[in-house]
Amino acid sequence: MNTPERFQLLSKTALVTGARRGIGKAMAIALAEAGADVIGVSQNLQKKGSEVEQEINALGRKFWALQCDLENRKDLYNLIKHVCANLPFVDILVNNAGTIRRKPASEHPDNYWDETIEVNLTAPFILSREIGKHMIKRGSGKIIFTASLLTFQGGINVPSYSASKGGLGQLTKALANEWAGKGVQVNGIVPGYINTDNTEALRNNPDRYSSILDRIPAGRWGEVEDLKGPVVFLASSASDYINGTLLIVDGGWMSR
């Protein structure tokens, strides 16, 4: 297999959570551009005719739209049961969906903590465990987590988010330790400061926006398209010997 062929995802099926917009939508489209069919999961994803579905269908790839509230454990297990019983084998699992709650730690309510941990950490673990079982049995699979710069840093006023993303970093390594020898590669992508809805509050704060921009050697905030190459790489056979890695895509922010 030559190098370009290693990046192709023809005959593969990817499940992407948070596929309706932002980073998840860009990742879903990127995987389709590389040849994969896509199962898109999001709480508010249109069952038919969404933008992501239209773009993926235009590429000649199949798209299945599934709605799921990842905070609802019963809803999540119903999703998994449906996928495993009725849809193609999931070759690539992209745990991208996430939520964030902003409030100082001394005022951070229980429900903020519980909701964030459930969506950002517990749901990805359950999805990985249940779909991972089938990957292990088959002897192949790719699992990718969307982590965060707050996997490494504490952040300000987002304790539940920081804890959840720190946990994802360790979960990536824990699963890789157990599953790498069974043909399943588990890795994470760490987006830097990307222009998405989640960073709107930061971008609307002139002081914070400037301080962040000043630290980015690339001289700009990232765009969702900057995550396309990394997700295709980690989903493809080009990354078969990469396990437990957190691939930082931040324009150099962490290097400062």
Residue ranges: model-predicted function:
Residues 36-51:
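Conserved glycine-rich Rossmann-like NAD(P)H-binding loop of the short-chain dehydrogenase/reductase
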Residues 104-105, 109-117, 212:
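Substrate-binding pocket helix/loop in short-chain dehydrogenase/reductase
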Residues 125, 140, 220-249, 254:
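C-terminal substrate-recognition "lid" of short-chain dehydrogenase/reductases
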Residues 148:
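Residue(s) in the substrate-gating loop at a strand-loop-helix junction
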